[in-house]
Regions:
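Predominantly soluble domains enriched in secretory-pathway, periplasmic, or organellar proteins
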Residues: 1-173
Length: 173
């Protein structure tokens, strides 16, 4: 939770730290690229403070792009400090999915060109939390705890498949 990432070389005689990066003051999520041909080439970390995510070189953790998550909620209200909750790497496309907690937006981050970064935001439900993939690795399911909903993203089509009311405080694990 201290927003410090460590890259450890497990192939060394004695595994050791080979790179370190501090991406903020407090963080919850880190992920690496999973799409075929891009495996572990890009790393991403999302922070609670400052409200941002950082894209890094997967071999060195050298920062390549920092993106602030400040913006509008799904209710069209400005939120100055939306924290980054879950981050997952798509298996369908070279993209990360980033939950901006308080805004209720799921960012789809295309990492093929970090200089000209392509971002798409999907409206889900406020207070996004944790999530994961279904068994096909096509659908990302994520809980919106305080909204009592589960959002489902079709990562093959890059669109919201459903936002499902589920009762009280869904929590994936």
């Amino acid at each position: 939770r201290d927003a410090r990432l460590n890259l450890i070389d497990l192939w060394m005689e004695k595994p050791d730290n080979v790179a370190e990066m501090k991406v903020g003051l407090e963080a919850r999520s880190v992920e690496t690229s999973k799409f075929k041909g891009w495996e572990d080439k890009i790393a991403i970390a999302g922070t609670y403070w400052p409200p941002q995510f950082v894209l890094m070189d997967g071999d060195t953790l050298k920062p390549k792009k920092i993106v602030a998550t400040r913006g509008m909620t799904v209710d069209n209200e400005y939120h100055p400090e939306p924290r980054v909750a879950a981050i997952v790497a798509s298996h369908q496309k070279p993209e990360f999915l980033v939950n901006a907690k308080e805004t209720g937006k799921i960012w789809m981050v295309d990492y093929t060109d970090l200089t000209n970064l392509k971002l798409k935001q999907l409206d889900a439900a406020k207070f996004l939390h944790d999530g994961g993939f279904d068994s096909t690795r096509r659908y990302f399911l994520t809980a919106a705890n305080s909204s009592d909903k589960i959002a489902v993203v079709d990562t093959k089509e890059s669109k919201m498949a459903a936002v499902i009311p589920v009762g009280k405080i869904p929590h994936p694990g």
